[in-house]
Amino acid sequence: MSKLTDLTMAEARDGLAKGAFTAVELTDAHIKATEAQRHLNAFIVETPDLALEAAKASDARRQAGTAGSMDGLPIGIKDLFCTEGVQTTAASHILEGFKPPYESTVSGKLKAAGAISLGKLNLDEFAMGSSNQTSYFGAVENPWKKTSDPKAKLVPGGSSGGSAAAVAARMVLGATGTDTGGSIRQPAAFCGITGIKPTYGRCSRFGIVAFASSLDQAGPMARTVRDCAIMLGAMAGHDPKDSTSVNMAVPDFERALTGDIRGLKVGIPKEYRPDGLSDEVAKVWDRGIEWLKAAGATPVEISLPHTKYALATYYIIAPAECSSNLARYDGLRYGLRVPGKTLDDMYKKSRAAGFGAEVRRRILIGTYVLSAGYYDAYYAKAQKVRRLIAEDFRKAFETVDVILTPTAPSAAFGMGEGTDDPVTMWLNDVFTIPTSMAGLPGLSLPAGLSADGLPLGLQLIGRPFDEETVFRVAGVMETAANFTAKPEGV
């Protein structure tokens, strides 16, 4: 039998149902894998004792015939989701030691389905970053290595870098992520796993530490398309505590994996071949198009003309919302407090000490674009361009069923690269941001390896609330890609 940590979530679920092993055995195997790979720094908080208690309760439910849809499956929770009684930091000094008195809706739904949390996963501070190097608790290391330089440490992508690294390194069967401009899809591509940002409003944002409220969306990260479908089924659903949560039935995403995509039209946007796109990524994209043709789908060239404005638009809207959301961290009620001579002095000192450089940068940008003299020139104009970007997608989906693009312009890069050049770092999300601006579902799956042995991902974009078609096409591509590689030593 395979090592328990090599099982996919679906395989582990079936094994538990057949009695091949217990939830305690499965959980213990993943706890040991987590302990053996602490050098990756994927977790901020590990909760092995709580996990084993939950596993015992899971085995009891199974014995009683009341097991949930994810009962006994070990997962990790990105440390942006509030977890009752367990430290939640958003990877920031300003929230160090904060233990929420309530549970986020998404983590609560997973717990109700029987999933077992092994702890809180590392991320870029307040989810602001594309490389997981901005965390107050240290950078996360990608478990993959370059064949040409095995000693070089690589980034896992961000902001959900801890989630991606933990899944790729077989510490957990799946993990929650959040995606504001690519924070599920880009790290999934860098770490050779699958991740989906659902349609905005599919999953509740209640209890998720806010970055940009009109963009943030929770989603699953796992090793296969089926595993993501299983997780999203448990995570999604209407929540009256979140006014942006959409009141519609949650489909059986797993049933969408029919393997039949004959007759579907797949959009190939011509604007997604910019200067600087690596030849390897372009070749993987072309290969993906051929896989879909072979399965009976028809590729159709489409135009998304406002794509070129998406990055600039995002870096006006997201910082504007971030500057507003992060105004609540004042050192008064919870988190870090640095004493000052006056109340204003205490605010300034607490925020200066509590926020990292990237977070301060985005707060400053946001405050600037919202200021009286610049609001119309920047923020109001950006919102108009955002509408045009969404309209491009709406028109495209009149003629195609899904859109296929690369996920990231390159494979994972080395730690320390680009940290002194924020614009270069922001360009990592050039293919994922337009989808976020339009609120559409986007899934990344591993499609091949670079010449240096690093994973390369492809992105599928769907119509609003049509994650089922995205999953259906992704399942076919996953079979064609037959991506079985894993990090060495895992």
Curated annotation (Swiss-Prot):
The active site is at K78, S159, S183. PROSITE patterns: AMIDASES. Signal peptide: none annotated. GO terms for molecular function: ATP binding; glutaminyl-tRNA synthase (glutamine-hydrolyzing) activity. One of its GO terms (biological process) is translation. One of its GO terms (cellular component) is glutamyl-tRNA(Gln) amidotransferase complex. It catalyses: L-glutamyl-tRNA(Gln) + L-glutamine + ATP + H2O = L-glutaminyl-tRNA(Gln) + L-glutamate + ADP + phosphate + H(+). It comes from the Bacteria. Keywords: ATP-binding, Ligase, Nucleotide-binding, Protein biosynthesis. Allows the formation of correctly charged Gln-tRNA(Gln) through the transamidation of misacylated Glu-tRNA(Gln) in organisms which lack glutaminyl-tRNA synthetase. The reaction takes place in the presence of glutamine and ATP through an activated gamma-phospho-Glu-tRNA(Gln). Heterotrimer of A, B and C subunits. Belongs to the amidase family. GatA subfamily. This is Glutamyl-tRNA(Gln) amidotransferase subunit A. It comes from Paramagnetospirillum magneticum (strain ATCC 700264 / AMB-1). The gene is gatA.
